[in-house]
Amino acid sequence: MGRGRVELKRIENKINRQVTFAKRRNGLLKKAYELSVLCDAEVALIIFSNRGKLYEFCSSSSMLKTLERYQKCNYGAPETNISTREALEISSQQEYLKLKARYEALQRSQRNLLGEDLGPLNSKELESLERQLDMSLKQIRSTRTQLMLDQLQDLQRKEHALNEANRTLKQRLMEGSTLNLQWQQNAQDVGYGRQATQTQGDGFFHPLECEPTLQIGYQNDPITVGGAGPSVNNYMAGWLP
C-alpha cells in the first residue's frame, strides 16, 4: 500500500517549524543552484522567514539586474500599451517595495544587534553580527575616551585660571600688607618725632620754685626743727661770712 496524501498545514511546534524551514530552505536553494548550473538558466530566488529574515540566491552577478530584467519582461512588453500614468504608478510601487524591503532589513538588523531574533541566523551571520558589535563597542569606547579627555582639558584650563586668580589675589594681599606696615611704621616715626620735640622743648624751660623768703648767699639746707634757740643760730649763721 502506498502512502496517503499528507495534508499541508502550518506546523504548530515552533522548534519543528524552524527545523523544517531550515531544511526546506536549504533544499530549495540547492535546487535553484543546480537548475542554474545544469540548464544555464538565470535563476533568482527570494525567501522571507516568518520573522522577516531574508534569504536569496541569484545565479547572475546582481539580484537587482535580474529583477530589472523581470520587470521589463513583465511590465514593459512592446505589445503592452501602458500609459504614462500607469508607468508612474508602477515605478512608484517598485520604489515603495524597495524602500519597504530596506526598512524591514534595517529593522531585522536592529533586532539582531539588540540580541533578538537570533534563532534563524547561521554561524557566518552570527560571526558578522559579532564583528559589528565589536566595531560598535570600539567606537563607543573611543567616543567616551575623547569626551573624557575633553572634559579633563576643560577642568585643567579652569584650574589654571583659578590658580592665576589666586596668585593675583595673594600678590594684592601682600602689597596691601606691605603698605599697611609702611603706614604703621610712618605713624610710629611721626609719634617718636613729636615726643622728641616735646622733650627738647622741656629742656629750655625749667619751672621756677618759689621760695617764701629771698635768701641771698644762703644755701638751702634742710632745717631741723629741734628748738627755738638752734633755729635762730642756724639762721644767723647763714648770714655770716
UniProtKB/Swiss-Prot annotation:
SMART domains: MADS
Species for this entry: Petunia hybrida
Primary location class: nucleus
Record-annotated MADS-box domain positions: 3-57
Name assigned to this protein: Agamous-like MADS-box protein AGL9 homolog
Gene3D superfamilies: Transcription factor, MADS-box
Annotated keywords: DNA-binding, Nucleus, Transcription, Transcription regulation
CDD domains for the chain: MADS_MEF2_like (cd00265)
Record's GO cellular component terms: nucleus
